[in-house]
Amino acid sequence: MAQITPELVQQAYDALASGDREQIRKYWADDMIWLVPGHNPLSGWKQGLDGFLGFMQEVGRLSGNSFHMDREAIMISSDASADVTRNIGNRAGDEARKLDINVIHYLRWRDGKVIEGRGAIFGDGTAQYDAFWS
């Protein structure tokens, strides 16, 4: 069993940001699941790596590829990690429509790969998140 470290978590996100599927598969399991919070068209469970990557592509499309996460902290346990991020972006075609929220991503790991992820949004960020993606 691979040890979860802050470096491993960062490498997983770096692979995801690269868009290189071969690199992504080193850290994200093919049978992973991901829960997108809120009540908007993107919300709900994403099944498998393809479902998750499809969600990420839609985030890029809707934000004109402006969406990014500034990682503030990473916490780890034997089979899970939680990272605190500031998620920022603006809606494609509407520069005034901005997203700026604080989020925790809770990740469960198996054999060095993410098998489950869930997002949690702080404070009034949930309303902002829903309005941004709706």
Give the positions of each predicted feature.
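Hydrophobic/aromatic beta-strand elements that line small-molecule binding cavities or substrate pockets
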Residues: 69-75, 88, 102-108, 119
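Short, cysteine-centered beta-strand-loop-beta hairpins and adjacent loop/turn segments enriched
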Residues: 64-65, 89-99
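Short, low-complexity N-terminal intrinsically disordered segments enriched in polar/charged residues
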Residues: 1-30, 132-134
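A short hydrophobic beta-strand element
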Residues: 77-87
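A solvent-exposed, acidic/Ser-Thr-rich amphipathic alpha-helical stretch
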Residues: 23-79, 125
